[in-house]
Every structure is written in structure tokens, then in C-alpha cells.
């Protein structure tokens, strides 16, 4: 009921004393890199404490969400190209082009007479296409991390908490028992 009434508390709703907010800005072309960036304007903005390069983009740390978002947009980024095909129409064309005669008659099993069976069969042909649909959870994607001496607490919407725990253990050097997701 809480989700349908807007009363659900998510990780993004967490507030702690001394908390800073980080946001990211990544290449709009899937898989594209970051050739370079100019963060001078963002670094001059009130409340911004850091602008850092990350894989495929930048991260901005600020004292509140609004300032982090504004600073991320103020960073001038030189984006690299994507190694992937751009839109659904191009993707469908690439898949269609991959259907070559090289594998047209390959079979794992060759039993019976297909041509004879098809002569008396009713044939239904159809083609269905749908665009890519990203996983879109109701919870805003976010993570809140609190690192204290020998303990790491993590609040996030995840379907794989063991993965989060293992990766955070590798990053922090903490034992799994000291990491709470």
C-alpha cells in the first residue's frame, strides 16, 4: 500500500548528519567513454566539494542533491563514441543482416521429411518487434553508504545484496560480517 500511496521510504530518502550527495553523469551513448572534461565551472559552484572522473563519465559530490545535479550539468564533457548500434531500427537491421546462408540449413537433428510435412500443414507466419525496454523499478536508483571504524552500512534497492557486500568488501578491505546491506 505504501508504494501506491507515495508513503514508501526508499534508500534515497535517508538523511544523516554530515551527509554529502554524489551524482553521476555518463555518456549518453551506451558504452561510450569519456575523452576528457572541463569541471572548472562546476568546481566554482556553491556546495560542490569534488568532481571526479569515473568509467564512462563524471561524478560530482556536493552538499545537497540540487547542487550536485546542477554541477553535473555544468561540467563540459567530451564524450567518446559508442561501440554499439544506436537505435532500435539499426539494431533490427543488424540482426536481420546476420541471417546469412552460412547457417541456413544447419541442424542439430535431421529426422523426418520437413518438405512433406509442410505440404499438408497450416502455416502461420508473423513478425513481432518491440523496442528495448529497460528495467524500470519504482524505487529511484540510489545508495546511501555510512562507513565508520570497522563497519560499513549500505542502504540501496538491490536484488543482489551478496554482490554488493562482496564488492564493497573488496573496495574497503572489510570482512563480510562488518558490511551490512
Segments (PLM) and residue ranges:
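Structural alpha/beta core scaffold segments of enzyme domains
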Residues: 1-181
Amino acid at each position: 500500500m505504501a508504494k501506491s500511496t507515495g508513503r514508501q521510504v526508499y534508500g534515497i530518502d535517508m538523511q544523516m548528519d554530515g551527509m554529502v550527495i554524489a551524482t553521476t553523469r555518463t555518456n549518453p551513448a551506451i558504452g561510450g567513454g569519456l575523452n576528457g572534461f572541463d569541471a572548472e565551472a562546476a568546481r566554482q559552484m556553491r556546495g560542490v566539494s569534488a568532481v571526479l572522473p569515473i568509467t564512462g563519465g563524471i561524478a560530482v559530490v556536493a552538499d545537497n542533491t540540487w547542487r550536485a545535479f546542477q554541477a553535473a550539468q555544468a561540467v563540459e564533457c567530451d564524450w567518446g563514441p559508442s561501440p554499439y548500434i544506436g537505435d532500435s531500427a539499426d539494431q533490427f537491421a543488424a540482426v536481420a543482416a546476420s541471417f546469412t546462408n552460412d547457417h541456413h540449413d544447419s541442424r542439430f537433428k535431421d529426422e523426418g521429411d520437413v518438405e512433406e510435412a509442410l505440404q499438408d500443414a497450416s502455416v502461420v507466419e508473423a513478425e513481432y518487434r518491440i523496442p528495448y525496454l529497460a528495467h524500470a523499478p519504482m524505487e529511484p536508483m540510489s545508495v546511501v553508504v555510512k562507513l565508520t571504524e570497522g563497519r560499513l552500512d549500505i542502504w540501496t534497492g538491490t536484488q543482489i545484496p551478496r554482490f554488493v557486500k562482496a564488492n564493497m568488501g573488496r573496495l574497503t578491505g572489510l570482512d563480510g560480517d562488518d558490511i551490512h546491506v
